[in-house]
Amino acid sequence: MGASLNEIKTKIASTKKTSQITGAMQMVSAAKLQKAESHAKAFQTYAEKVRKITTDLVSSDNEPAKNPMMIKREVKKTGYLVITSDRGLVGSYNSNILKSVISNIRKRHTNESEYTILALGGTGADFFKARNVKVSYVLRGLSDQPTFEEVRAIVTEAVEEYQAEEFDELYVCYNHHVNSLVSEARMEKMLPISFDEKGDEKASLVTFELEPDRETILNQLLPQYAESMIYGSIVDAKTAEHAAGMTAMRTATDNAHSVINDLTIQYNRARQASITQEITEIVAGASAL
Amino acid sequence: MSENVMTLQVITPAGVVYDHHANYITARTTNGEIGILPNMISTITGLEIDELKVSRPDDETHVDYIAVNGGIIEIKDSLVTIVADSAERNRDIDVSRAERAKIRAEKALEVAKAEKKSDEIKRVEVALHRALNRLNVSSHN
């Protein structure tokens, strides 16, 4: 019974206030998560359509791809687009993704000149800067429901750097949202664009009338395709961020409640002890008379 | 459903903007204006920043206008799909926002021209074109 009654009382009050704040933050995150989920759903239809048109266009072509965005170059330098959050209080969300990126980079590269990093979100940018890793592009302050316009800057930057042969392949590293409790770190190859992995999709037998010609359309469509894929991962990552925030805040609130319970028991015991002591003193005083 | 009807879907990253039957569509592609009728040959082509005119089978006199910011149009089995960065129906356009975008683009264009940055000029011109297109489409109300 080290602490005095008053000390325990203030502790209980302050923990209660903290739990109210974390409780409110949990609800805010929950609301944002719901919004982000519906946003991701709307985007899914777009991504599917772009993919379908691109496969329609590419599959009817028997010649090897000539477009620079589809040609596999010899890999001299790899770009990593790392998506993290801007603020903390999201549990293990950031450390998960950064850990997986670092271990992957260590496995694949021996030399620092073999890779470059594009950071989306302040936590990731600061993390790499603190470790003296070269970050070629930073985008901070993304809103909670990023619009296509907002992320266009970093997406276009990535696509342009690829086209300028700054790097020869691009991976996007982000947390994939599975459900509100689970997310998994993912590393996806975005560029060069390949359709090999979707071998189960039947090549359409319809021949298309192409105007003006295939190359021109591909030049317009492929950047749009790449942009939509990258934007898709950003939306996915944001959804995971809100889910992580919600879970972290729920855990914090639960912890606060258990701390308050313990403290209340401690407080009652201390009070009981002081009462007992008082009675003993009175009884002892009375019997001494 | 009668034979001479096609479906038009306009899809953007923000979701499906337009999903209706249509019996005639006019669009401006990179190669010039085209009219699309049901059962047309399968086509894929790029679109300009311009308006899309759609006449629907349920009302002969009514025409829907949609502002499209570029994108790709695919026509296949009487299903017309347009994927674009952004697109708005005339009734959904926020006129005051479009006005502001136009003024902003005009100012930026002057600055860019004064500084003679050709990339910047091109980009601002596209932005201005988009704003003008939105205003133009919204005037069809």
Curated annotation (Swiss-Prot), chain A:
Statement: the UniProt record of this protein carries the keyword Nucleotide-binding: no
Keywords, alphabetical: ATP synthesis, Cell membrane, CF(1), Hydrogen ion transport, Ion transport, Membrane, Transport
MF-aspect GO terms: ATP binding; proton-transporting ATP synthase activity, rotational mechanism
One Pfam family, short name: ATP-synt
Keyword Cytoplasm included in the entry's annotation: no
SUPFAM superfamilies: ATP synthase (F1-ATPase), gamma subunit
InterPro entries linked: ATP_synth_F1_ATPase_gsu, ATP_synth_F1_gsu, ATP_synth_F1_gsu_CS
Membrane topology classification: Peripheral membrane protein
Subcellular location: Cell membrane
Gene3D superfamilies in alphabetical order: 3.40.1380.10, ATP synthase, gamma subunit, helix hairpin domain (1.10.287.80)
GO BP, one annotated term: proton motive force-driven plasma membrane ATP synthesis
GO annotations of cellular component type: plasma membrane; proton-transporting ATP synthase complex
Biological role: Produces ATP from ADP in the presence of a proton gradient across the membrane. The gamma chain is believed to be important in regulating ATPase activity and the flow of protons through the CF(0) complex.
NCBIfam families per record: ATPsyn_F1gamma (TIGR01146), PRK05621.2-1 (NF004147)
Listed PANTHER family: ATP SYNTHASE GAMMA CHAIN, ATP SYNTHASE SUBUNIT GAMMA, MITOCHONDRIAL
HAMAP family cross-referenced by the UniProt entry: ATP_synth_gamma_bact (MF_00815)
Subunit structure: F-type ATPases have 2 components, CF(1) - the catalytic core - and CF(0) - the membrane proton channel. CF(1) has five subunits: alpha(3), beta(3), gamma(1), delta(1), epsilon(1). CF(0) has three main subunits: a, b and c.
Protein family per UniProt: Belongs to the ATPase gamma chain family.
Protein name per Swiss-Prot or TrEMBL: ATP synthase gamma chain
Native source species: Lactococcus lactis subsp. cremoris (strain MG1363)
Name of the gene this protein is made from: atpG
From Swiss-Prot, chain B:
Keywords associated with the record: ATP synthesis, Cell membrane, CF(1), Hydrogen ion transport, Ion transport, Membrane, Transport
Matches recorded under InterPro entries: ATP_synth_F1_dsu/esu, ATP_synth_F1_dsu/esu_N, ATP_synth_F1_esu_C, ATPsynth_dsu/esu_N
CDD domains for this protein: F1-ATPase_delta (cd12152)
Keyword presence, Ion transport: yes
Pfam families, alphabetized: ATP-synt_DE (PF00401), ATP-synt_DE_N (PF02823)
Record localization: Cell membrane
Gene Ontology, cellular component aspect: plasma membrane; proton-transporting ATP synthase complex
Subunit structure comment from the entry: F-type ATPases have 2 components, CF(1) - the catalytic core - and CF(0) - the membrane proton channel. CF(1) has five subunits: alpha(3), beta(3), gamma(1), delta(1), epsilon(1). CF(0) has three main subunits: a, b and c.
Name of this protein: ATP synthase epsilon chain
Organism: Lactococcus lactis subsp. cremoris (strain MG1363)
This protein's encoding gene: atpC
